[in-house]
Curated annotation (Swiss-Prot):
Assembly mode: Binds, via its C-terminus, to the PID domain of several cytoplasmic proteins, including APBB family members, the APBA family, MAPK8IP1, SHC1 and NUMB and DAB1. Binding to DAB1 inhibits its serine phosphorylation. Interacts (via NPXY motif) with DAB2 (via PID domain); the interaction is impaired by tyrosine phosphorylation of the NPXY motif. Also interacts with GPCR-like protein BPP, APPBP1, IB1, KNS2 (via its TPR domains), APPBP2 (via BaSS) and DDB1. In vitro, it binds MAPT via the MT-binding domains. Associates with microtubules in the presence of ATP and in a kinesin-dependent manner.
UniProt modification remark: Proteolytically processed under normal cellular conditions. Cleavage either by alpha-secretase, beta-secretase or theta-secretase leads to generation and extracellular release of soluble APP peptides, S-APP-alpha and S-APP-beta, and the retention of corresponding membrane-anchored C-terminal fragments, C80, C83 and C99. Subsequent processing of C80 and C83 by gamma-secretase yields P3 peptides. This is the major secretory pathway and is non-amyloidogenic.
Family: Belongs to the APP family.
Coiled coil: none
Record keyword Transport present: no
Family matches, as InterPro entries: Amyloid_glyco_Abeta, Amyloid_glyco_Abeta_sf
Highest taxon of the lineage: Eukaryota
Key words of the record: Amyloid, Cell membrane, Cell projection, Coated pit, Cytoplasmic vesicle, Endosome, Membrane
Function: Functions as a cell surface receptor and performs physiological functions on the surface of neurons relevant to neurite growth, neuronal adhesion and axonogenesis. Interaction between APP molecules on neighboring cells promotes synaptogenesis. Involved in cell mobility and transcription regulation through protein-protein interactions. Can promote transcription activation through binding to APBB1-KAT5 and inhibit Notch signaling through interaction with Numb. Couples to apoptosis-inducing pathways such as those mediated by G(o) and JIP. Inhibits G(o)-alpha ATPase activity.
Protein name: Amyloid-beta precursor protein
Provenance organism: Felis catus
Cellular compartments annotated: Cell membrane; Membrane; Perikaryon; Cell projection, Growth cone
Length: 40
């Protein structure tokens, strides 16, 4: 259960980063999303 919740939480977090990058609609937003995603 713990592992499953971790995976599910990661997917949701990743989707939020992608949405943020798309919402910004700029290279800066995309780069920030990739940097944050890479750290996590």
């Amino acid at each position: 259960d713990a592992e499953f919740r971790h995976e599910s939480g990661y997917e949701v977090h990743h989707q939020k980063l992608v949405f943020f990058a798309e919402d910004v609609g700029s290279n800066k937003g995309a780069i920030i999303g990739l940097m944050v995603g890479g750290v996590v």
